[in-house]
Amino acid sequence: MTRAILLVLDSFGIGNAPDAAAFGDAGADTLGHIAHHRAASGRPLALPHLASLGLYHAHHLATGEWAEGITPPETLDGAYAAAAEISSGKDTPSGHWEIAGVPALFEWGYFPDKTQSFPPDLLEALIEQAKLPGVLGNCHASGMPILETLGEAHIASGKPIVYTSADSVFQIAAHETHFGLDRLYALCEIARELLMPYNIGRVIARPFVGETPETFERTGNRRDYAIEPPTPTVLQKLHDDGGKVLGVGKIGDIYAHCGVSNVIKAHGHDALFDATLEALDEAGDRTLVMTNFVDFDTLYGHRRDPDGYAEALEAFDRRLPEVLAKLRPDDLLILTADHGNDPTWTGTDHTREQVPVLASGAGLAPRPLGHDDGHLVTFADIGQSLATHFGLSPMAHGSDFLDVAPTGPSSHASTTGD
């Protein structure tokens, strides 16, 4: 029986990418800086199960250093690598598409102006078609600060809050009760169509509740309106070949529901874990279970909260054995990330980083993966390896790491003297 489980720790980078300087991210290191922050506070980061799968070894490949305050295990239970991205952006669709074997090699559209960010013609069309009294925001912003600033004005005026960031994104925040959730979704669908000529990757509905800046809170009813991948992903190929793809969390939205057989919605990491375990119980032969753990990014990366990020990682690590216990002998488990979001970095945007690839099962020996002592060429090696695992035709990008021979019995030993 052939199954695969792909867990995406959204934004969990492990050191700046080779081209990070072009993005203003030279020196970014989500894992390394979280570990440093915790070590400096006398509470070393504790991720024993991720460590046993090769997390710290992957970080060592990416940076040449061991994360501060950790002791890498001398023996491992998984294969590991550090993967770099060739897609043009450092956003969620680019990372996920490339993970699925389809890198975004084109340039996304962006709204670079920090204020008055959107073209007047676009906003006028949105206001007219959606019959709005106007809009608020029209700027670069992070989600909670803009609610604290404009939430009360939104409730009083009925004008939705529109904003963007360094990503290719158009976000709309509106109150679930005062504006209406269905109305927000309908507004986002209008915006999605209007934004097609601008080549914007995502429109995101950001519903919230509360009555004052102190009580405003975003809800779990977020919805992403993405464009379709330009060519079939490994998800689409598996689906078209008679297999099944169970997308947990926002996976369906990220891929514009292309190739996703069933969508299992859940909000919060514990609920996402529960849904993943239920999906594994349901998954039969030739099934891919794919989950995005989004809170690392939205709650801790963008909000520059290294303590919260560390605690979320430790909570994830504590639950990881529940997934491991459900694996069958031929299952392939892969843990990775779609980009970085260093919570100690300047600003509030993603960071261009390498990501871990931690793989277990399917006959993989504990070792570095890939072609250069563990460094994968692209995120797309994951998609290519999944294609091989499921017996699909090859992807146009990436190399299969399942067939690479081990580099020797000592290849996964730790060298703590580095």
Curated annotation (Swiss-Prot):
Biological process (GO), any one: nucleotide metabolic process
Keyword Metal-binding tagged: yes
Keywords attached to this entry: Cytoplasm, Isomerase, Manganese, Metal-binding
Presence of the UniProt keyword RNA-binding in the record: no
EC number(s) recorded for this UniProt protein: 5.4.2.7
Major localization class: cytoplasm
Cofactor: how and how many bound: Binds 2 manganese ions.
Cofactors named for this entry: Mn(2+)
Catalytic activity: 2-deoxy-alpha-D-ribose 1-phosphate = 2-deoxy-D-ribose 5-phosphate; alpha-D-ribose 1-phosphate = D-ribose 5-phosphate
InterPro entries xrefs: Alkaline_phosphatase_core_sf, DeoB, Metalloenzyme, Phosphopentomutase_DeoB_cap_sf
UniProt pathway: Carbohydrate degradation; 2-deoxy-D-ribose 1-phosphate degradation; D-glyceraldehyde 3-phosphate and acetaldehyde from 2-deoxy-alpha-D-ribose 1-phosphate: step 1/2
Compartments, record wording: Cytoplasm
Binding site residues for Mn(2+) 2: 297, 302, 350
An MF annotation (GO) of this entry: manganese ion binding
Positions of transmembrane segments: none
SUPFAM superfamilies assigned: Alkaline phosphatase-like, DeoB insert domain-like
Pfam name, any one: Metalloenzyme
Record: residues binding Mn(2+) 1: 10, 338-339
Family to which this protein belongs: Belongs to the phosphopentomutase family.
Stored NCBIfam families: deoB (TIGR01696), PRK05362.1 (NF003766)
Protein name from the UniProt record: Phosphopentomutase
Organism: Chromohalobacter salexigens (strain ATCC BAA-138 / DSM 3043 / CIP 106854 / NCIMB 13768 / 1H11)
